[in-house]
Amino acid sequence: MKSFQLDEILGQEIALTFLKRYISKPETIPPLLIFHGPDGTGKESASERFIKNVLCFEGTSCGICASCKSFINNSHPDYIRFPEESGKIIPIGSEDNPEEFSIRWLIRSRLNYRPHLSRFRFIVFPDASLIGNEAETALLKSLEEAPPFSRFIFIVNNLDKLKETIVSRAICVPFQYLNQKDLRKINTSLGFSTLPFQGGSLISSECPKEVLDLVQEK
């Protein structure tokens, strides 16, 4: 079974400080969090762990309550994760019958309805740079008028890929390259004989993509 403990995310002390504070006081979570930083630094893994903790009835990612079981089984009704397809823009959706995982679909059929199981609903965009211009404008209005139980998480490599009007309304949670000590820990846990250490950073151009993927999964 996959573990969902935040402390398993290595080398991201600044980000974890933000997230642990919000877990202890979930009512202070802002409408929009932006997780930003290089590939392979655990942004999506951290978002999953953070959300599971907040949605948990005990606030501890207990693994036992109905919320945790639903999350583990990928069936939590209050966790909406937009699919990530390389290069495919997330559309605003048609006026009459917006397709699933379009922005109009989200606004009309999910955003303003109360959560089914937990106290909050989370909407996650694993690559927020794929949100189309028209869709981003529509989302901006929703962020300004978000119901008290809905929270957004945008994940992006570079804040410059988002509109300034979006970024200015968010709390930005930074993720950074890992130092050599943490890389060696991951190296050992994954069973690799070597990892490319360059200046204490995990640099995507010098590290195989499959290694980056494994690091992020951890």
Residue ranges and their predicted role:
Residues 112, 137-154:
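Conserved catalytic/switch belt of AAA+ P-loop NTPases
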Residues 1-134:
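Clamp-loader machinery-focused feature within the broader ASCE/P-loop NTPase space
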Residues 1-53, 70, 148-151, 156-218:
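Charged, glycine-rich active-site and insertion segments that engage polyanionic ligands
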Residues 99, 120, 127, 131-135, ...:
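Short, well-structured alpha-helical patches and their helix-loop capping segments
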